[in-house]
Swiss-Prot record:
Organism: Thermoplasma volcanium (strain ATCC 51530 / DSM 4299 / JCM 9571 / NBRC 15438 / GSS1)
Protein name: Probable cyclic pyranopterin monophosphate synthase
InterPro entries, alphabetized: Mo_CF_biosynth-C_arc, MoaC_sf, Mopterin_CF_biosynth-C_dom
Complexes and interactors: Homohexamer; trimer of dimers.
Pathway, per record: Cofactor biosynthesis; molybdopterin biosynthesis
Function: Catalyzes the conversion of (8S)-3',8-cyclo-7,8-dihydroguanosine 5'-triphosphate to cyclic pyranopterin monophosphate (cPMP).
Name of encoding gene: moaC
Length: 150
C-alpha cells in the first residue's frame, strides 16, 4: 500500500497477525491440449509440476515485481490445479504471520502458474497464422482472505 504522498505505507506500528489469502484463475485451452497435459505429453515437461514451482516462485518474489508491496515472510504456498474439458484452473493459498496482507502474493502465484502453462503449451495452441484463438486467461481474483490475532 502507498500513502497519499506516494510512499510505501509504514506498517511498523501494526500488530503481527496470522493471515491467509486464496486466489483463483483459469486458462482456457484446446481440448487436445488438455489431453496432452493430462497424459504428460507436453514437450517442455510436466505442466502441472513445473507450473506449481513457478507459482510458488512468483508468490515469493511479489515484492520484487510490485514496488509498493512489502517483503513479507511467506510461511506457506499451496498451489492446486483442476483440469476441466477446456481449461486449467489454478488455486493458490498463501499464509503468513505478519503486519500486512498476503493477497497480492496469492494473485501473483496464480498469474505465474497460468503464464507458465501458456508458455509450455503455446506450440499446441497456435493456429495456422501463429495466433491463439482459443487460448485465454480469465477470472483471476481473490476468493478468500482471512486474518486472526495470534
Amino acid at each position: 500500500m502507498i500513502d497519499f504522498d506516494g510512499n510505501m505505507i509504514n506498517i511498523s506500528r501494526k500488530d503481527v497477525v496470522a493471515r491467509k489469502a486464496t486466489a483463483v484463475g483459469r486458462i482456457y485451452l484446446r481440448k487436445e491440449t488438455i489431453t496432452a497435459i493430462k497424459n504428460n505429453q507436453v514437450k517442455k515437461g510436466n505442466v502441472i509440476e513445473i507450473s506449481r514451482a513457478v507459482g510458488t516462485m512468483y508468490a515469493k518474489n511479489t515484492f520484487l515485481q510490485i514496488p509498493y508491496c512489502h517483503n513479507i515472510p511467506i510461511e506457506g504456498v499451496d498451489v492446486d490445479f483442476s483440469l476441466g474439458e477446456n481449461y486449467v484452473e489454478v488455486t493458490c493459498s498463501t499464509t503468513t504471520s505478519y503486519k500486512t496482507g498476503i493477497e497480492m502474493e496469492a494473485i501473483n502465484c496464480v498469474n505465474g502458474a497460468l503464464l507458465n502453462i501458456w508458455d509450455m503449451v503455446k506450440y499446441l495452441e497456435k493456429d495456422e497464422t501463429g495466433n491463439y484463438p482459443e487460448t485465454r486467461i480469465e477470472g483471476v481474483h481473490v476468493i478468500k482472505k482471512t486474518k486472526s490475532q495470534e
